[in-house]
Amino acid sequence: MFARIAITGAGIISAIGVGKNETLRSLIARKSGVGRLRHLQTAHSELPCGEVNMSDEELKNALGLPTGSIIPRTTLLGIIAVKEAMEQAGIKGTDRAALISGTTVGGMDLTECHYIQEGESSFFSLHDCGSCTDGIADFFGGFGLVTTISTACSSAANSIMLGADLIKSGRCDVVVAGGSECLTRYHLNGFNSLKILDSEPCRPFDATRNGLNLGEGAGFVVLESEEHALNRGVAPIGALDGYGNACDAFHQTASSDDGEGAFLAMSKALNMSGLKPGDIDYVNAHGTATPNNDASESRAMIRLFGDKIPPVSSTKAFTGHTTSAAGSIEAVICLLAIRHGFIPANLNWKEPFDGGVVPDAEGHQDVRLDHVLCNSFGFGGNDSSLLISRYGK
C-alpha cells in the first residue's frame, strides 16, 4: 500500500492574479483576465489573451533580480509560483527534494528575437525548455533532482503525476511540481495557424464556441508523503488521491471523437483512489472552447458519470489556455475551491450544444467539495486527470 500523497503548498500566477489570494478574489468575483495584450508585441494584437499584468522588468524587481538580466519570462513566472508554494510548505531545496516543471514554449520569448538576425547566435542554445527549469532551480539554490516535462497541454499535470511517483518510490521526500508558460509570438502564431483561436472571449461548452484564448502563467504544488508532512509538523492543504494518463494517439492536434483518452485518464484516476464516479463533487474540465475538445470531453464525462454528472466548469475563460501550465494552475484553483467551498463559474456560457455537458455557468458558493477531478488534455491525445481531495477525507 503506497503512502498517501499530501499537498502542503501551492503557488500560482496568471492573468487573474499574482498569488492565491488575488486568484481567489478574481474567481469569486467572476473577473476574467482575458483581454487585449499589453506586453507582448505581435501582429495579432486583436486576439484576446490571458496575459499576466506584469512586465519582465516588474517580475524581476519583485524577485530582487538585476534589471536587464537575461531571463526567460517562463522562468520568471515559474519562480513566482514556486516561491509561494515553498513558503507555504515551509521547505527549501535539498538533496532529497525535486523540482519538476512542465513547459513547451520554454524561453522562446528570447530565442525568437534572434531568428531574424543574420549569422549564428549562441542564444539558440540557451533558452530551451530544460534551461527554464534549471533557471527556476538556480534561484532557490538547487534541488537534488531537476527535470522538465514537455507533453503540450498535459505537461503540468504529468509533472505532478511524476512527482507523486517519485515520492511513492522513495526516490524523493519532497517534490515541487507544476508548470510554467509564457506568451510568445511563436506560441500565438502556432495556434493561430491551427485556426483554433477565437477573436472574442472564449465560451467553453457553449453552442457558439469558436476556439480558445491563449494565456500564460505558472502553478506549482509541494508534494510529500502524509507521514513526512506530519513529521515536519505541517498540515496538508489537500491530497492527491489519484491520477491517470492515457494516450489515444488519435491525431496530432485534435481530440478523439469518442473521448477515449479522456475517459481512460479519468477512470484511471478514480481506480487509483478507490473512489466511484458518484464520489466526485466537481470536475474542472479541460474545456478549451474549441468545437472539437468540448464535444470530445463531454462524451467522455457522459460515459463516465452517466446521467449523474457532477458540477462541471472550465476556468480557461478566466485565465486563458495556459497550455503547458494549465494542469497545475487549475490544480491550484481546485485546491482553492475545496478550501473555500465554491465552484468556479464557467464564464460566457449561454446555450448548450447537442451532446454537450451543461456547465455551471454562474458558479456556486458555500458548497462542500471533498473530491474533484482536474483534466488536462494535450496534443497527440496525451490526456491526464488528477483527483484532488480535501485532506482528512
Language-model segments: residues:
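Conserved catalytic cysteine-centered active-site region
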Residues: 1, 36-80, 96, 106-117, ...
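ACP-dependent fatty acid/polyketide chain-elongation machinery
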Residues: 1-67, 89, 227-239, 332-346, ...
